Swiss-Prot record:
Molecular-function GO terms, alphabetical: ATP binding; proton-transporting ATP synthase activity, rotational mechanism
Any Pfam family the entry gives: ATP-synt_DE_N
Gene3D superfamilies given in the database record: ATP synthase delta/epsilon subunit, C-terminal domain, F0F1 ATP synthase delta/epsilon subunit, N-terminal
Keywords: ATP synthesis, Cell inner membrane, Cell membrane, CF(1), Hydrogen ion transport, Ion transport, Membrane, Transport
Subcellular location(s) of the protein: Cell inner membrane
Main localization (coarse): membrane
PANTHER family linked: ATP SYNTHASE DELTA/EPSILON CHAIN (PTHR13822), ATP SYNTHASE EPSILON CHAIN, CHLOROPLASTIC (PTHR13822:SF10)
Topology within the bilayer: Peripheral membrane protein
Protein's UniProt name: ATP synthase epsilon chain
GO terms under cellular component: plasma membrane; proton-transporting ATP synthase complex
SUBUNIT field: F-type ATPases have 2 components, CF(1) - the catalytic core - and CF(0) - the membrane proton channel. CF(1) has five subunits: alpha(3), beta(3), gamma(1), delta(1), epsilon(1). CF(0) has three main subunits: a, b and c.
Biological role stated in the UniProt entry: Produces ATP from ADP in the presence of a proton gradient across the membrane.
């Protein structure tokens, strides 16, 4: 039997996942992180993108988060996310439209233009689209 760690994924809407996993793979502020049992304690920011859980038996489950924090303790991993969606629920066409809308907003700067907000919307939409495309490429869906 593989060694596991307890993982919780929570957002403002509530608990999204709680269970034992062999590994958690997330996109941290300084790059990708792979967390397994025995990982050193850690708290880090998470960028928008996929969170991949490798469950017991090797089954993978993927979620999209819009950002948040990751806390690692000796027997527990906790993801505190701004928003979470199961990757299977993401729609590629909607993600592409969001990228186009964000790019258009960046190109059509008005008097009250907020560059930081527009850039954040573009980064989130692009991360969501990347997540959908990665899943389609890996699982052929």
């Amino acid at each position: 039997m593989a060694m596991t760690v307890h993982c919780d994924i929570v957002s403002a809407e509530g608990e999204i996942f709680s269970g034992l996993v062999e590994m958690v793979v997330a996109h941290g502020e300084l790059g990708d992180l792979g967390i397994a049992l025995g990982h050193a304690p850690l708290i880090t920011n998470l960028k928008p993108g996929p969170i991949r859980l490798i469950k017991q038996g090797g089954e993978a489950e993927v979620f999209y988060i819009s950002g948040g924090f990751l806390e690692v303790q000796p027997n527990m991993v906790k993801v505190l996310a701004d928003t979470v969606q199961r990757a299977a629920d993401l729609d590629e066409a909607s993600a592409q439209e969001a990228v186009k809308a964000a790019e258009k907003a960046l190109n059509e700067k008005g008097a009250d233009f907020d560059y930081g907000s527009a850039a954040a919307r573009l980064a989130e939409a692009a991360a969501q689209l990347r997540t959908v495309q990665q899943i389609r490429k890996k699982f052929g869906g």
